[in-house]
Amino acid sequence: MNDEAVAFSQAVQVVDPDVRAHVYSLVTALGGFNGEDADRYVLGDDALACLRDIRRWLKLYDEKYHRMDVARCLGEANLVNGDLLPIFSLWWSTGQKSKYMSRIALACLELLVPLTWPLEVHGEMTVNHHRHFPYLQHAQVSYKRGLLSRGDLNFLRTIIRIGLPSMAVPRSERTTRDDGILKLMLYLLRNIVVIAPNARLAADGDEEETSRSATINAFQAQDVFALLLTMCSNVGDDFNMQDVILLEILFHLVKGVNVQKLFMDDAQRSAKHTDELDTLLKQESSLRREYAKNAPTRHGRFGTMIWVKRDDAKVSTVSGQDVLKDSQATLQKMDESKKWNRPQPRKTHEDSVLNNDFSTPAHLNSTASRNLRMFVEEFLDSGFNPLFTHVRKALEREADRVVPINSRQFFYTVAWFLDAERARRARQQEMHLQNGKPMKELERDGFGLVASVLDQETLVFLNRSMQISFDQKDWEDLNAEMRCFTQILLTVQEMTQSLLEEDQEIAENIQNRIFYEETTHDRVLAIMREYKGQGFGYLDACTELSHVFLRMLERYSKENVDMQVRSRRRSRRKNMETQVAAPEDNNEEHASDDEDIMEAERICRERKFDFKRFAAKFCNQKCVDTFVAFTKFFRELNSDQLKRAHRYFYRIAFKQEMSVLLFRVDILNLFYTMIKGPGAMDSSKPIFKEWEELVRQVIRRMIKKIDQRPALITELLFSKMNSTLFYLEYGHERQTLPSVRRAPAELEVNPSEATTQEDKIKIVIGALVMDGQADLVAWVSNVLGTAAEERESWEAYEDAQRDEAQGAPRAPNPMIAVLPHDDACKQAMYFNAKLRLLMTLVGFERLGMEDVVGASWVVPSSQGSKDLKGIKLTIDKCLEDPYTGDIEHDPRQMLRRKYKPDDKEHNRQTTLDVDFGSESEGEDVPDGPLFPPNPRSKANAPNDSKTRRKNREAVGEREPIDEDTLEARRKARQENTRARLAKIKSELFVHASDDESDEEADKEFFDLEEKRRKEQAARVRKALLTGVVDEIGRKANKKSERKRLSNSGKSDTQSKRQRRGRTTEALDEDDDIIMDGAVARSSDHATEDDENTSATSDEDDEFDFDDNLAFRRDRDLDRDPVLPSHAEDMQPTDTRELRDNDENAPVATLARRRLRAGFVIDSDSE
């Protein structure tokens, strides 16, 4: 035991002495300062070999054996600050043109990169790593301090100078060595940005010298920002292999920087800091006041212990003088002393915090803020689109230079720069308004500067990455992706309010693509529900995403009442398996088309989006728990975050009427603490009033609900299940009706596989036998045999009766009931589609219209005994030798779903139900749209659902769009939709066959039309001569009478003429002359009939007139071209004289005829 104590007391050798000796000898041989000139560094005789040996030691010892001994020895020997940096200075001042010195400078750069490489905590760390880790962190901070601030020496510019020759070489001529030099230069810049003092270790020197502000100022002063801008803007042309390194540099530069503070001027930033300091002082004073209430006095420094007698006669011991104040303080002290040793789940070990800590703020001074803002603005103008487009493509194809952490960096950096772009626009607008200029004079740039992350490819990549991260529970990646998605939504929202019409249209398109996918809606909901202690950063990101997504989706669904979403889980896709080519007739082709149309119709019916139904999905206990966990940080939350939580609870309690979800003891206690304390919210904040009113209303509703449902007192202790929610809300259990299975879809045999009844029966029996249901086929055969015997007996009886009574009519055969032999057969008669098809093929019929289990099936009276025997014989043959087909001809695959004709007609007439919300709908088109829209095909369904935003007039001032403006825009879009629907010519009336020509069919058609005209002309002449009107004429007269009464007057005729096609005006001009003559002659005949006929009824007079009016067009069509002998009848003067002579005769208003495809279309034939 004494030996162990002695061994423990001895000094532990942290590094092998031999290794230390070798490394020290190499550092000494490298060079040093001359005694004569202490400021001048002198290289050793073999300095280049020493540098290469040191690099070899780092690679072969530290990296190979996973140790840090060589790095520790180099840090103790002060290699970087004592040798490498002076060598850089020597090369910069004297040896830039020397090839030897350039090689030495490059060797120093090769050493600096591994020595400054970020130290990461990972699962493979050894004891040696943990031993050297703190020291190396201190050493790297000293390296960074020497590189950033070393008097007037610009080491960063020196490093850039080393890589300039390689940058000047064109990419096609660049060698591997040039790419390596560029990579070393960028990696060193990345390392300098990443290195930061460890907060857990004592600071060595001034922390400001190595802070983020010092790094940014040094980058600005030594042209590092200019280098980054140059490479980012040309990343696709000259620096395609350096895109990922540039992304890492940008990520570590902007990580944790507050965008809003960055784009403030000095006065605003100073005021912001003053407000923050004032808030902190108020919090401190509040804590002091709380403490002063229970602080011990100078005479009360003795211990205090009291017993608290509880309601159950038990006694608890509480210590401390603060319990003497009152009973409430005593009970609170008891609650604070309670501890629940909740089992903590095993935390997943996080490899590194360099790329994870998004929430830790980075404080910048005014100079650094100004320099970084200038760089960010220039980067947005020139380098944003090239860099992020190239990086996204590299991430998608998983290039060799890409590591998994780069995806997280990509999404976070995109989110940060999108937020910066919106902040820059807001700052430009604010400065413009401060100068007193109207908004219309502000020349705003479009959002094309950030268009590379708003395209469809980026959205697809983002959605796929979010789903992968969520499935693999990679919460840090999901955190960055949620931030990116939120910033894209906010950017699109700002684009909708842009003054540029192009931005508005792009925003409309992006929203349509985002909200069209129902998987996106489900993913946002699932992220909210799956929060389980992932940290405040993740909690902030997921609550912000759900808040923004819900608000934008609600606004978009109100603006687009016909919004539809695509649900891939519900879509019924057609089986696209290749089939053997076989000749199909026209009926089969039409059946296939009908199947496609019916499939598209089913999908469209499932795409209708209901926002209330979607918002109700967020009304569950898991989502409430997520926002409750977020609200527990109310003392650290800002106004926007508090408003976010307030809006969610308001939506739950009042919009969705689900306030029961909030009736839980811990939630109510949290609300009460936020308002009444201890540690309540600051009452001077504007959001405090809104929270106070919300809490008051929630508690008031809870008290009313307790009066109605006393069981709620018990339920306050627990989370609410769905059944409990329904009972507490409505006072009774949910009435659940037993689910009734519907009858299966009706099947049929594919017409290309079988045409005769025998073949169809063979296929169906083969399918049933392959399914193991031969007993059902045997049952059908037995039923047919029994029915044949019974039918044969009845026929013999009828023959005997007819022989006895000569001439007696034959009575119809009675129907024979089809009875199942057991309950399983009874169920199969309803649920087995193949059996139902077989029963239909053999001639069985179902009685009644209701198709339910146990419905009666009968053998109809039309089937004789011979027919039944023949069918039974066919079934027996198929059952003895069932048709099984082969691999390519499976009888089960020869069956398909049967569609009813009315389904096809309904499918053709289906259109989108657009509710315009106005009683004036259809004023321009009284009977609604003339044609329904074409059915959507699967290929263009997403594109057809896009609605193009109407161009808006530029407004004078840019202000937040109010509800009245949004309502006016919605009405304008509705009017535009109505006008567009009135002009639609549907596929229902326009087919490709209209363009084809068939001379024989045309000849037959024209002959038939000529025959109809002659028959119609004969009926007209008969009616004019005899005054007798047949039934056909009367029907036409009634239609003509209604048409005459509804279209009397010149103005009505003109409006009706305007609704007709304007393309027929030229053709109709020549027909007016013929129409005038026809009217004159018909009026003359009517006058003669009135003179020669005795007094008749008014109805007969009307018939006479309506005959002339209704048939005058056909009469003129049957006549030959007008002869000169009848010219006087067509003169306007004669027509006027006839009208003057017969003043009592009604005068018909001339109407222009409508022509379509060369034929007269009467208005009644529409």
From Swiss-Prot:
Localisation: Nucleus
Residue stretches of biased makeup (Acidic residues): 585-594, 916-926, 1087-1107
One of the protein's GO biological processes: meiotic cell cycle
Keyword Disulfide bond in annotation: no
UniProt keywords, alphabetically: Cell cycle, DNA damage, DNA repair, DNA replication inhibitor, Meiosis, Nucleus
Major location (coarse): nucleus
GO molecular function, one term: DNA binding
One GO cellular component term: replication fork protection complex
InterPro entries registered for this protein in UniProt: Timeless (IPR044998), Timeless_N (IPR006906)
Signal peptide extent: none
Biased composition (Basic and acidic residues): 881-893, 966-981, 1109-1142
Sequence similarity: Belongs to the timeless family.
Record protein name field: Topoisomerase 1-associated factor 1
Gene name of the record: tof1
